[in-house]
C-alpha cells in the first residue's frame, strides 16, 4: 500500500518501498534468510527493525539476557547490522544509524542512515521523494500485532519486557459465539513501538489458530500504519485497488448513540466503511484490509487523542470474522456444533 519502490539495494535483489517514515524492504535475494523463511511460511514478514542508541550494546545486552543472536553476512560496503531471533524465528534488527539522530539537521556531517549506505535511488526518484514520499498520506508504523500459540502470550510479553524494557498497556479477553481471543498490548519505553500479542481465548480453534495453520507458525498478524487524514487515505487506497474490509450499514446507525459528540461525519464514515471508537475529544478511526501477504493484513489508523486499539470495535469485528469462518466451513455454527454432541 505504500507506492512504487524508490530505492534498490547496491548489491542484492532487494527493493526498498517508502512512504512517510515507513520503510518496507522486499527481499528476493537467492539463498538469503528471507528466501529460506519464505519457503517455510510463504508470503511473510521475516524481519523487523528497532532503532536503538547503540546497536552493539543493545545486542550484547540481549544475548546476556538469553536472546539468540543471528550471524548475517554483510556484503561489500554494507552495514553489518546485529540481529536477534524474534517471533516465529523471524529477526529483530538493531539499527543505530538514521537521519536526524540526536537532532542532526540536513547537511550535517555524519547525518546519514542505514538506507543511505545500503541503497541507491532508482532513476527518476528525487531526493525529497526518496526520503519521505507522500503516497496516500501514511506516516509511521503504529503497531505490529503478533499471533502466538495458546499459552504463549505471557511468554512473548515477557520476552519484550526482559530484552527491551517494554511494558503492558492493555489487556483484552474477547469472546465470540464459539471462539475467543486474548491479547496483551506491549509498548517500548519511548512509546513509539507497540506490539499487541494475541492467543486463542478458548479450547475451540478460531481465528488465531487459522492464522497459525496457514502461516505454519507464530508471526506477525497485521501491520498498522497511521494517517493524519484517514478519509483521504482510504480514498487513495481504494483508487489503487486495495481491498478493504466491509462494515455493515447497521454499524453506523449506532455510532451517535455509542459515542455522543464524536464530531465525525457519519455519512463520510459509512461511505468509506471506516470504523470509529473512543469518546468525545479522544477519537480513533480505523479500517482493515483483506489478507494481503498470505494471512497477513494491514490496518490504517488515525488517532485524535486516543491511544487505544479500537477496543469498542473488537467484539463486533471478532464476531464478523467468526461469521466469515462459519460461512467458509472453518467453524461450525452453534446449532450444528450442538447437534453433534
Regions found by a protein language model. Give the residues of each.
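Phosphate-binding active sites in nucleotide-utilizing proteins
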Residues: 166
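Ordered core of a single globular domain
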Residues: 225-228
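Short, small-residue-biased leader/transition segments that mark boundaries at the very start
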Residues: 1-5
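Vicinal oxygen chelate
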Residues: 18-28, 50-142, 146-148, 153, ...
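A conserved active-site cap/scaffold subdomain adjacent to cofactor or substrate pockets
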Residues: 153-159, 220
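ER-lumen resident redox/N-glycosylation machinery signature
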Residues: 33-38, 95-96, 135, 204-212
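Long C-terminal interaction/binding lobes of large macromolecular proteins
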Residues: 217
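Basic, Lys/Arg-rich alpha-helical nucleic-acid-recognition elements, primarily the DNA-binding modules
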Residues: 6-7, 13-18, 23-28, 32-40, ...
